[in-house]
């Protein structure tokens, strides 16, 4: 019972924070398996984006199949995912922050690059070590 109460308190706090200030970045939460009934961690994501039409898809990946949230208006033409989990149990999500130093990357170029990286990682990564190796091998600057 304590686990359910802790999850409820966390979700209420997140909801309060997300609705009390204007937000132009994605909201997310990672909930430890220590407080879930089955011991598995939870990922929670809310997309605050101009792409209002989103849906979940099942993708036959190169190495691993996965379920992901995609923009409805440009999928499958663009291979972008914003949160997902693959058949190896690897899960990944993006949160876009617009208050960081931009450097040479325009806001319009930052989001889609995140989506491309997440889509590809869900196809080929099974572990955090795989993902670190993947990040080390992509062309820099990557636009993420």
Predicted regions and their residues:
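A surface/extracellular/periplasmic glyco- and lipid-processing/surface-interacting theme
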Residues: 115-144
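Sequence-pattern detector for short linear motifs
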Residues: 5, 48-50, 123
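Serine/proline-rich low-complexity intrinsically disordered segments, especially terminal tails, linkers
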Residues: 5, 20-22
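Bacterial N-terminal signal peptides
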Residues: 9-19
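A contiguous strand-loop segment
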Residues: 24-113, 137-144
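A generic structural signal for short, solvent-exposed coil/turn residues
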Residues: 15-17, 35, 84, 131
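Bacterial N-terminal signal peptides that target proteins for export
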Residues: 1-10
